[in-house]
UniProtKB/Swiss-Prot annotation:
This is Non-structural protein 1, peptide 2. Belongs to the rotavirus B NSP1-2 family. It comes from the Viruses. It comes from Rotavirus B (isolate RVB/Rat/United States/IDIR/1984/G1P[X]).
Length: 320
């Protein structure tokens, strides 16, 4: 499928891998151990993509198409000027910039790039759903405290069966603990290999563990105004490509306690009225707000619009 088609039609997060019209006989999904969790994005030719270099990251996370506030372990695509990414979405090459939660603005080529319409990340900090300013970079948002990644290393001489570029070694990056420093995928380069196969390949050679916050604790804290430390600056430096490390500068961070989020408002109503309201996503611009007795499908343009409509519905139902 095409990237914009994925944003419009996807009903949940998924691992996105590239396939190429110049090599139609190959599809990495067919050799994946969990093909049901992988989808393919079609591209014309890998030669049009930004080249891989040692030090690039591949985020070990699914891509989530939703922009409303929800507890999620994936990376997200904010509204932005450039909505035509090249190559694998989770491959942080020199044409992409990772925007960790907790970051409000950066200075890029002397221009200020600012995030807007913040929602709550799974760690309790805030990430933007719209990034203003004209830029050729493609922005993705992620959790600054809980986004594991692998680092691309040197080429080993063999060719990837999918993109036909040289295969590369890869190393455990942020979020991993491993006694081995270098791995090689059997058929494809790290950029073309599904993330679960990358991790599975690492476990074949010894004990590998995720160095991440407790998932159950983050889930419990999500309804309350609790957050992990704001580590956006260290995540920004560790996850982005070394080719752009000197270009952007972190200018401002966002406080997790500034204002009440949609999730916190609904959780407060549920505790006060003993109800069970929840937001169920339908697609990128539609959600279902419901409890056991009533429900409403809400179409929205952005998160401010969604917040206002949820407050209007709660007022109409006399919960506010």
């Amino acid at each position: 499928m095409e990237f914009n088609q994925f944003l419009k039609e996807a009903s949940g997060k998924v691992d996105l891998v590239p396939i190429y019209m110049s090599n139609p006989s190959c599809n990495p999904i067919h050799s994946s151990r969990k093909p049901g969790k992988v989808s393919a994005l079609k591209y014309d030719n890998p030669l049009k993509e930004c080249p891989e270099i040692p030090g690039d990251s591949v985020l070990i996370s699914d891509v989530c198409p939703f922009i409303h506030e929800h507890f999620c372990g994936g990376i997200h695509i904010p509204y932005q000027h450039n909505m035509r990414p090249k190559g694998r979405i989770t491959h942080v090459s020199a044409d992409k910039i990772v925007w960790p939660c907790g970051l409000r603005s950066i200075k890029l080529d002397g221009k200020l790039v600012v995030g807007h319409m913040f929602v709550k990340c799974r760690c309790g900090n805030m990430y933007p759903t719209w990034i203003s300013g004209e830029s050729d970079f493609f922005f993705i948002t992620c959790c600054a405290n809980d986004t594991p990644a692998i680092k691309i290393g040197l080429a080993n001489g063999d060719k990837c069966q999918n993109c036909l570029r040289l295969k590369r070694w890869y190393n455990p990056g942020p979020g991993f603990k491993s006694g081995i420093n270098h791995y090689i995928a059997p058929f494809f380069c790290p950029v073309c290999t599904p993330i679960r196969d990358l991790v599975s390949n690492m476990t074949r050679f010894g004990a590998v563990s995720f160095d991440s916050p407790d998932y159950a604790e983050m889930k419990r804290n999500y309804d309350w105004k609790r957050s992990y430390p704001n580590n956006c600056e260290s995540a920004f430096r560790s996850l982005n490509s070394p080719l752009i490390q000197t270009l952007p500068t972190v200018c401002d961070t966002v406080c997790a306690s500034s204002g009440t989020t949609v999730t916190e408002m609904i959780a407060s109503i549920n505790r006060s009225w003993c109800t069970g309201f929840k937001i169920i996503p339908i697609n990128r611009t539609r959600v279902l707000l419901k409890d056991d007795y009533r429900g409403r499908i809400i179409e929205f343009q952005d998160n401010n619009h969604l917040h206002n409509q949820i407050m209007a519905a709660m007022t109409e139902w006399k919960f506010l």
